[in-house]
Amino acid sequence: MKSILIKIENIIRNEMDKIGGQEIRMATLHPSDNWKKTGGWDAVDVLFKVNSRTEKEYALGQSEEEIVTPIAQEYAPSYRDLPLAIYQIGQKYRDELRAKSGIMRGREFGMKDMYSFHESQDDFDRFYEIVKEAYLSIFKNCGLEVKVTEASGGNFSDKISYEFMVLTDAGEDDILYCLSCTHCANVEVSKEKEGELCPKCGKSKLQRGTAAEVGNVFDLGKKYPKSFEYTVKDKDGNDVHPIVGCYGIGTTRLMGTIAEVFGDEKGLVWPKEVSPFQVHLVRLGVNEKIIESADRLYEDLRKKNIEVLYDDRDLRPGEKFADSDLIGIPFRFVVSDKTVEQNKIEVKKRNSSESVLVSQDDVIKILE
């Protein structure tokens, strides 16, 4: 699980760095004073609240607006310091009444959250679109097809936000989407109903589907800078409140969604981009030639920097194959009496029922 999360986080990190995001580490313990300034201490009902031995009140971080705004206030006092985009990848805590579905909705979960600060609405709008495109690249690189969905801003904003939804029965949201264009809206904010013509293209009737939210982007406006009395000097020397954007991706939920979308009745089917290993090497038999052949293949793969899970257990083939299907690594390489006799390797893709025999010289080419 950890190696999958690391790969997902690195995909995210790569795209955030490309668009100018600066990675930092923000506090997990939030002073209550910060939350009281924004009104969130009493208004947000999912806060885990704790008291120190010195009777100071804190909240476990469920989002970072109350922490990141004072950081920007200290380090970006002028329009020359903007735009500023900072992000972190870490753990969040929410006192959910109905935590369920494992890592899809828990009281502790992984999150990438980025915040951007801008002098003008035009500059924010420009960056907002850049982040949306970066998010599409992230989800594509994770093997997912997402729908950019109009949604409510919830506790964060009174403006329309955008959520990145993946169609799956494991989701908790209902969306209406068009098959002929990119229009998609959460049923909570949609002015149209299922079966009505798409308001964007007018070509198809809107379909209803269940989806999982894997990311979101919000226009927070000037709400948080006003709460903290954060202003910057503009080009004319005037004090103005910066405009803030918020961009989140639930890393553990993203992993769970990938598992739900690509899994089958036998187990998991990890896309190669996030799979914990590229190859599941299964050795069948314990005679010297089989062991030597399997060990040599393992070392050859490792020398090519190919991640390999080597199953050298003394179990029946059926048990090993069942475990292999359950784990869901993209390629299974089998070394057995049959393959050793023919100087070949049996290769099977996890998402295929067919296997082929490939010469040992060519087996690595399959992974290229």
What are these regions (language model features)?
Residues 1-368:
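NTP/phosphate- and nucleic-acid-binding module
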